C-alpha cells in the first residue's frame, strides 16, 4: 500500500511539473516567442490580459501605446503577436498567411464568404469571380454605375437635402449619419442587385433606422464568438448563451432581410441558368450578382467536386451567393457611411475649406451643381477621381478616422516563419492595425491632427508621397485586401461632390464625434451627427 501511495505521489508530482513547465517555464523561457517583448507581464502565460483589453474596447489605443514603448513586434498573448512595421506587414499580408477561426463570425447562413474563408486558395478562387467588376477601370466606365448613381444622388439624396432647407420647414438639423448609411447601402445594394431590385433606404427613413438598430446589435455581440469560440459553443449547448437573445434575433432578421433580396432575384437566377438574362434598363443591371452567379455556375460545370470551391461554395450555390452578398452589403454600407460622416464633420468645421472644395468641384465639366435651366449631369469619373483637394480630404479622413481601425488577424504557416528578427512557430495569431500604422510619425507628422494638406501634391516630394502611401492601410494590403475599395472611393467622392457642389454645411450637434469607438470598427460614440444645410446661391 505504501508503494502505491509513493507511486501516486510521484505521478502527481510529475503531472504538476509538466503543467508548470508547459504553462509557465516553456512560454516564458523556451518558446520561440519568449524573445519578443511582452506588452504586459502576464502575456506569456495567459490570454486574460488581451481578452480584457478587447472586452473593455481599448485594444487599438492599448496596442499602439505598447508599440511606442516596445517596438514594432510585441507579444500580446501566449500565442499572439501584434506588428506595426512595414516589413512585418509585407511578410504577413503579402505572404499568403491564412485567416484564423476568428473570422468565422463573418460566415453567413452557415457558409463562409470570401472575407471569412480561411484558406488562401479558396479565397483566391472566389475573388477571381468578381474582381473585374470591382476594378477601378470597370467602375469608372460602367453605364450601369453611372445610371444608378444618377438616380440615387439626384432622385433620392439631394431632394432630401433640398427639403431640409425649404421655407415650409425652415432650416433644421439633419442627422447625416443616418443619411450616409442610407446612401451607401443604396449604392452597394443597387450595384449588386440592380436599381429595381436593390434598396431604397434613402426613401424609407423608418426602416433604415430599424435596420441600423439591428446592425448595432449584431456588431455589439461578436466578442465571445470571436475570442472564445469553444466556450461559446459549450455554453450554447448547456443552455447558457453568452450572447443575449436580442442579438441572435437581430442577426436572424438581418439574415432574412438579405435572403429576401436574393429571393427577389430568383427569376433572374433561373434566366441566367438558361443563358438568357432578362432585358431591362441600364440602371437595373445586377452587376455583382451576374458576375458571382455566372462564375459559380461555370466553375461548377467545369470542375465539379474536384474544385477547391466545392465544399463551401459549389455544393450549394444559393447559400454561397447569399452569404457572399450579405457580406458585401453590410461591409459596403458601414465602412463608407462612417467615412462620409467623419468627412462631413471635418468639412463643416471650416467654411473656407468648403469654399475651396466647391470651387474645385464646379470646375468640372459637367459639374454637379443643380440649376433650374439644365438637366442634372454626372461628372466624368476619371476627372472627379483626379481632383486633388477632394482626394486629399478623403484620404486624410480615411487615415485618421479609418472605418476599420482594428487588428486584421492572420495565422503563421504550419512550418513557422520569421517575423523581423524573431522566429515564430506555426499557428500563431498575428495582426497589424490601421490605427497604429496610420499614426507612424515618420510617415504622418503630428498624426493625431486632421491635416488634409499632407496629401496635396504640392506639399510633398515623390519619396514622401511613396512613404505615405506605403503606410496607408485603410483597406489592408496584399491579396486579401478589401475588394470593394475602388467602389467605396468612387461612391464617396460622388456623394461629397453632389453635396458640396450645392450646399454648405454647419455643425448643429456633434456630441460624441471626437470619441471614435476603439475596436475592429470605428464608429462615432453617439452614432449620429446633426448638420444644417445651407443652399449655395
Residue spans for each PLM region:
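Cytochrome P450 C-terminal beta-domain/meander region
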Residues: 68, 72-74, 379-396, 407-431, ...
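N-terminal membrane-proximal hinge/A-helix region immediately C-terminal to the signal-anchor transmembrane segment
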Residues: 2-125, 150-152, 163, 183, ...
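Hydrophobic, well-ordered secondary-structure elements that form the walls
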Residues: 397, 427, 450, 478, ...
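Cytochrome P450 heme-binding "Cys pocket" and the immediately downstream C-terminal segment
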Residues: 197-198, 351-354, 461, 467-468, ...
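Cytochrome P450 I-helix active-site segment
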Residues: 209-214, 348-403, 425-426, 451, ...
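Short, small-residue alpha-helix embedded
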Residues: 335-348, 495
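Cytochrome P450 heme-thiolate monooxygenase catalytic core
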Residues: 100-107, 142-340
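Conserved cytochrome P450 K-helix/beta-meander segment immediately N-terminal to the heme-binding cysteine loop
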Residues: 432-462
Amino acid at each position: 500500500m505504501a508503494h502505491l501511495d509513493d507511486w501516486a505521489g510521484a505521478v502527481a508530482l510529475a503531472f504538476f511539473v509538466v503543467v508548470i513547465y508547459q504553462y509557465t517555464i516553456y512560454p516564458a523561457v523556451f518558446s520561440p516567442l519568449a524573445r519578443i517583448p511582452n506588452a504586459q507581464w502576464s502575456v506569456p502565460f495567459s490570454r486574460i490580459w488581451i481578452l480584457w483589453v478587447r472586452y473593455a474596447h481599448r485594444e487599438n489605443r492599448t496596442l499602439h501605446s505598447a508599440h511606442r514603448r516596445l517596438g514594432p513586434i510585441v507579444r500580446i498573448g501566449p500565442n499572439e503577436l501584434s506588428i506595426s512595421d512595414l516589413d512585418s506587414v509585407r511578410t504577413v499580408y503579402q505572404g499568403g498567411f491564412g485567416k484564423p477561426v476568428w473570422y468565422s463570425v463573418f460566415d453567413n447562413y452557415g457558409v463562409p464568404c470570401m472575407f471569412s474563408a480561411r484558406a488562401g486558395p479558396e479565397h483566391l478562387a472566389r475573388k477571381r469571380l468578381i474582381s473585374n467588376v470591382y476594378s477601378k477601370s470597370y467602375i469608372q466606365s460602367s453605364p450601369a454605375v453611372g445610371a444608378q448613381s444618377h438616380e440615387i444622388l439626384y432622385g433620392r439624396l439631394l431632394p432630401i437635402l433640398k427639403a431640409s432647407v425649404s421655407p415650409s420647414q425652415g432650416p433644421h438639423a439633419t442627422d447625416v449619419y443616418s443619411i450616409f448609411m442610407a446612401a451607401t447601402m443604396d449604392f452597394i445594394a443597387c450595384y449588386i442587385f440592380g436599381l429595381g431590385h436593390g434598396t431604397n433606404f434613402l426613401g424609407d427613413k423608418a426602416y433604415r433606422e430599424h435596420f441600423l438598430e439591428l446592425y448595432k446589435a449584431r456588431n455589439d455581440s461578436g466578442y465571445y464568438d470571436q475570442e472564445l469560440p469553444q466556450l461559446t459553443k459549450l455554453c450554447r449547448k448547456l443552455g447558457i448563451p453568452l450572447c443575449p437573445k436580442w442579438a441572435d434575433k437581430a442577426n436572424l432578421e438581418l439574415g432574412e432581410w438579405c435572403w429576401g433580396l436574393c429571393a427577389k432575384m430568383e427569376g433572374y437566377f433561373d434566366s441566367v441558368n438558361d443563358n438568357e438574362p432578362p432585358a431591362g434598363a441600364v440602371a437595373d443591371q445586377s452587376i455583382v450578382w451576374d458576375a458571382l452567379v455566372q462564375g459559380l455556375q461555370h466553375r461548377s460545370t467545369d470542375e465539379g467536386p474536384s474544385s477547391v470551391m466545392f465544399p463551401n461554395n459549389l455544393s450549394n450555390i444559393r447559400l454561397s451567393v447569399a452569404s457572399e452578398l450579405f457580406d458585401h452589403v453590410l461591409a459596403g454600407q458601414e465602412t463608407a457611411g462612417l467615412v462620409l460622416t467623419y468627412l462631413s464633420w471635418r468639412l463643416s468645421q471650416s467654411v473656407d475649406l468648403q469654399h475651396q472644395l466647391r470651387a474645385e468641384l464646379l470646375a468640372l465639366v459637367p459639374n454637379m451643381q443643380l440649376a433650374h435651366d439644365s438637366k442634372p449631369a454626372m461628372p466624368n469619373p476619371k476627372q472627379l477621381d483626379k481632383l486633388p483637394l477632394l482626394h486629399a480630404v478623403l484620404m486624410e479622413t480615411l487615415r485618421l478616422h479609418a472605418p476599420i481601425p482594428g487588428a486584421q488577424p492572420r495565422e503563421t504557416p504550419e512550418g513557422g516563419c520569421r517575423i523581423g528578427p524573431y522566429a515564430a512557430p506555426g499557428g500563431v495569431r498575428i495582426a497589424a492595425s490601421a490605427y497604429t500604422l496610420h499614426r507612424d510619425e515618420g510617415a504622418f507628422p503630428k498624426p493625431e491632427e486632421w491635416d488634409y494638406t499632407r496629401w496635396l501634391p504640392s506639399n510633398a516630394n515623390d519619396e514622401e508621397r511613396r512613404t505615405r502611401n506605403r503606410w496607408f492601410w485603410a483597406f489592408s494590403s496584399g491579396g486579401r485586401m478589401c475588394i470593394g475599395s475602388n467602389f467605396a472611393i468612387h461612391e464617396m467622392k460622388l456623394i461629397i461632390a453632389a453635396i458640396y457642389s450645392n450646399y454648405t454645411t454647419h455643425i448643429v450637434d456633434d456630441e460624441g464625434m471626437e470619441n471614435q469607438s476603439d475596436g475592429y470598427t470605428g464608429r462615432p460614440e453617439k452614432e449620429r451627427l446633426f448638420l444644417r444645410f445651407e443652399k449655395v446661391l
